[in-house]
């Protein structure tokens, strides 16, 4: 026999899948009322708030998740996404660094740091973190493509012809690697 808490929780998951977010929120709040330390309920509730762009509620709910269990790198990563939507980049960077301190090979966290630096037009720092993505996942063709794009931006702003040539060389190698990896992924999906 399934208990009340689980019934609400599984109903919430079904409602999330069907994009019936208001009902999912109601069900998740009921789960939390029955068990105020249910990390999965808080996590899913925060995700729903994020998906419906209710960022302040998402932030509050992620804060509660961290209070319950401060050792989950995903929660810090997800809270960083909320901070980015709120243009609170410093807070997002702190959360991403925390996520990485918990999980050193969290390539998505390195990638999101590169996104923040790109938004701030700190292109060399962005490239630095894309290279960290590739250290943890050398098959990430999107990271190679982003490196290509960022070096092309640097080329436009660089006066030194030697550096321009170096940047162009790196950009072209990155584009080629991205294309090759993307092609391989596409072929493997067709099989």
Predicted regions and their residues:
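Alpha-helical segment of the N-proximal tetratricopeptide repeat
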Residues: 4-34, 40, 47, 51
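Helix-start (N-cap) detector for alpha-helical repeat units in TPR-like alpha-solenoids
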Residues: 5-6, 39-40, 73-74, 107-108, ...
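Register position in tetratricopeptide repeats
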Residues: 17-18, 51-52, 85-86, 119, ...
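Canonical positions in the second alpha-helix
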Residues: 30-31, 64-65, 98-99, 132-133, ...
């Amino acid at each position: 026999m399934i208990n009340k808490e689980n019934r609400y929780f599984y109903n919430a998951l079904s409602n999330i899948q069907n994009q019936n977010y208001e009902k999912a929120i109601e069900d998740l709040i009921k789960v939390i009322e029955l068990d105020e330390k249910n990390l999965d309920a808080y996590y899913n509730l925060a995700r729903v708030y994020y998906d419906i762009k209710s960022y302040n509620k998402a932030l509050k709910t992620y804060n509660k998740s961290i209070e319950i269990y401060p050792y989950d790198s995903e929660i810090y990563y997800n809270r960083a996404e909320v901070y980015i939507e709120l243009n609170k980049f410093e807070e997002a960077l702190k959360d991403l660094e925390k996520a990485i301190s918990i999980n050193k090979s969290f390539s998505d966290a390195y990638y999101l740091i590169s996104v923040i630096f790109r938004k701030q037009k700190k292109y060399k720092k962005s490239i630095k973190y894309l290279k960290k993505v590739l250290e943890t996942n050398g098959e990430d063709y999107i990271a190679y493509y982003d490196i290509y794009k960022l070096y092309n931006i640097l080329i436009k702003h660089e006066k030194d012809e030697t550096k321009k040539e170096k940047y162009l060389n790196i950009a072209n190698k990155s584009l080629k690697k991205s294309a090759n990896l993307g092609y391989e992924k596409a072929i493997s999906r067709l099989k």
